[in-house]
Amino acid sequence: MPATILIGAQWGDEGKGKATDLLAKDIDYVVKFNGGNNAGHTVVIGGDKYVLHLLPSGILNENVVPVIANGVVINPEVLFDEIATLNSRGVNTDKLVISANAHIIAPFHRTIDLVTERFLGKRQLGTTGRGIGPTYADKINRIGIRVQDLFDKSVLRQKIEGSLSNKNHMLVKVFNRRSVSVTEMLDYLLSFAERMRPMIADTSLLLNNALDCGKHVLFEGGQATMLDVDHGSYPFVTSSNATVGGAITGAGIGPTRVNKVIGVAKSYTTRVGAGPFPTELHDEYGEWLQKRGYEVGATTGRKRRCGWFDGVVARYATRINGITDYVLTKLDVLTGLDRIPICVGYKVGDSVFREMPVSQSDFHHAVPIYEDLPGWQCNISECESFDSLPPEARGYVLALEDLIKARISVIGTGPERENIIIRHPLGIF
């Protein structure tokens, strides 16, 4: 049975959690394949808000098996804190499965992340300080600590010693910090081993067997296309592949398994942290979007930078990921505007770009080319069909659809679970 991949089409915070929750009734497995606790998924169910940083959003559906695959980096302390929080609210987490090959975020990874970011000064990347980058760096440098290492004390000690050999030197000599004790770190990580043991599996085998048996599998991307380490606005990116290729390698499935790629985009654009953002607004409209959209990072608590919809970015996401369908979120936030600009291209010096510039220097200096569309004034949160939307809202959706070169199948019209319009049944399976 083919699989479906869900991808953020902008800079994250597009509403992927709500999209996953929407699809959960039709799926058997939800798989997190990249990142760690450096992003937050927010889902509102019956007026109750759930914010997940590490666990897959599908864990809120009791019929779904949530999987943390090999491409994820795991802070075990955060893992058990999230599990405890959900359990206290009546959510059953017993079905959670974790890859033995996922990498572990240790406290020293977080320390390295924070002191390195401070050391960069004005060149800071705006990381979340959760230790994600240093953990992936250890993975690439082949000195990482994997989940399976927690169950062999001698191997774990060797891995910790290997990882700390250069870090302690850097902490002491460069950052004037104290060195990290191998024994203390060993005891700390071993304290999680037995609690994690029942959750551990070969998740690649599990998922491929599930697909062979006709089970429905959804791969839920963390972060988004423009934060992808290869295809995003480098170096202001995350440390993993947040595009469709990341699902293949980050979960251990073959590309022929994939049937549909669903992109999630806001009806406007937001970004957290440093980096280029051509349509960013520094005026009352930017403030208006931030307040109306409650644009505060679920992980960092930082106000999100806000701007108009960027068609160049979304069309780029369509191309990079092979997106077949879009979920367009937060259309209701735009209610009340007399006019709504959308970015259809960039101007850099005397050059005009209709597609994403390959040069990051050009992207940094890109000036958006806007087309204005008429706004609407009426409340759309209770609209149940595309035809029941005001004509201006329908026109806005159709204009975006033409711009991004993929159909917009689902439209979010409010924060609640039921505030959606199914324009085209996704038919994901």
Curated annotation (Swiss-Prot):
Q: Which residues does the annotation say bind Mg(2+)?
A: 13, 40
Q: What is its main location?
A: cytoplasm
| MF (Gene Ontology) | adenylosuccinate synthase activity; GTP binding; magnesium ion binding
Query: Looking at the record's lineage, which domain of life comes first?
Result: Bacteria
Q: How is the cofactor bound?
A: Binds 1 Mg(2+) ion per subunit.
Annotated IMP binding lies at 13-16, 38-41, 128, 142, 223, 238, 302
- Name the keywords, alphabetized: Cytoplasm, GTP-binding, Ligase, Magnesium, Metal-binding, Nucleotide-binding, Purine biosynthesis
Q: Does the keyword Kinase apply?
A: no
Q: Which reaction does it catalyse?
A: IMP + L-aspartate + GTP = N(6)-(1,2-dicarboxyethyl)-AMP + GDP + phosphate + 2 H(+)
Cite the EC number. Answer: 6.3.4.4
Indicate which residues the UniProt annotation says bind substrate: 298-304
Catalytic center residues: 13 (proton acceptor), 41 (proton donor)
A Gene Ontology term for the protein's cellular component: cytoplasm
Subcellular location per the Swiss-Prot or TrEMBL entry: Cytoplasm
Q: How does it assemble?
A: Homodimer.
- Described function: Plays an important role in the de novo pathway of purine nucleotide biosynthesis. Catalyzes the first committed step in the biosynthesis of AMP from IMP.
Entry's HAMAP family? Adenylosucc_synth (MF_00011)
Record-stated family: Belongs to the adenylosuccinate synthetase family.
The protein here is known as Adenylosuccinate synthetase
Q: What is the lineage of its organism?
A: Bacteria, Bacillati, Actinomycetota, Actinomycetes, Micrococcales
Q: Please state the gene responsible for encoding this protein.
A: purA
